[in-house]
């Protein structure tokens, strides 16, 4: 990375993931996953449902894993096969859930951000996006990156919150919307 960024924001949502690098209090760069939703919240949700778990209960299971399965950073098709094989071999739900949490983070760090070493991330990391409500994903990030991450209480709505702050800042009393009403449509 050359210069260590003052702060980085890792955002993993239901369908995408991004890394926003802040330098001199300004967004310096944004990296976004290109196509696959592997490692995003919907991916974990699908697995949880396939095993008859809520996302919350599935995430809690991961915290009791003894041997998380290694799914690497592959696409969902390959991960599905790997999970099915692990199930046949007797892997517990906890080990599957933890393996998925690790794969989410590995995918974000090594495929999206394209780090060669997790320590290149720096130390001032804010995580956001609904996927980070999953404590297993947060803990996996902290273990792999070797840092303590800051997770706001409103991690899942940080983007909307930021947009609302900008709208409030730019609002003027005499502003008239150009948005069509239902009757005009």
Locate the predicted segments by residue.
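Short, small-residue-biased leader/transition segments that mark boundaries at the very start
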Residues: 1-5
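Adenine-nucleotide phosphate-binding core of ATP-dependent small-molecule kinases
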Residues: 81-110
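Internal, active-site/partner-interface "lid" segment
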Residues: 54-85, 175-184
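Glycine-rich phosphate-binding loops at beta-strand->alpha-helix junctions
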Residues: 103, 116-142, 155-159
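Glycine-rich phosphate-binding loop plus the immediately following alpha-helix
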Residues: 24-67, 156-159, 165-169
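Gly/Thr-rich phosphate-binding beta-strand-loop-beta motif of the actin/hexokinase/Hsp70
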Residues: 6-23
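Acidic, glycine/GT-rich loop-and beta-edge segments that sit at the periphery of enzyme/chaperone cores
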Residues: 18, 166-185
């Amino acid at each position: 990375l050359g210069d260590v960024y003052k702060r980085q924001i890792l955002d993993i949502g239901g369908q995408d993931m991004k890394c926003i690098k802040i330098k001199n209090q300004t967004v310096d760069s944004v990296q976004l996953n290109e196509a696959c939703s592997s490692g995003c919240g919907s991916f974990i949700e699908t697995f949880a449902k396939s095993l008859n778990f809520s996302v919350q209960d599935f995430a809690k299971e991961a915290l009791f894993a003894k041997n998380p399965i290694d799914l690497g950073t592959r696409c969902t098709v390959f991960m599905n096969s790997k999970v099915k094989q692990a199930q046949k071999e007797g892997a517990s739900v906890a080990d599957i859930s933890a393996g998925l949490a690790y794969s989410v983070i590995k995918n974000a760090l090594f495929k999206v951000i394209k780090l060669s070493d997790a320590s290149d991330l720096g130390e001032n990391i804010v995580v956001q996006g609904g996927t980070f409500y999953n404590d297993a994903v947060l803990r996996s990030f902290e273990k792999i990156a070797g840092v303590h991450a800051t997770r706001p209480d409103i991690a899942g709505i940080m983007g909307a919150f930021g947009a609302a702050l900008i709208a409030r800042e730019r609002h003027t009393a005499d502003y008239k919307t150009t948005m069509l009403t239902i009757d005009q449509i």
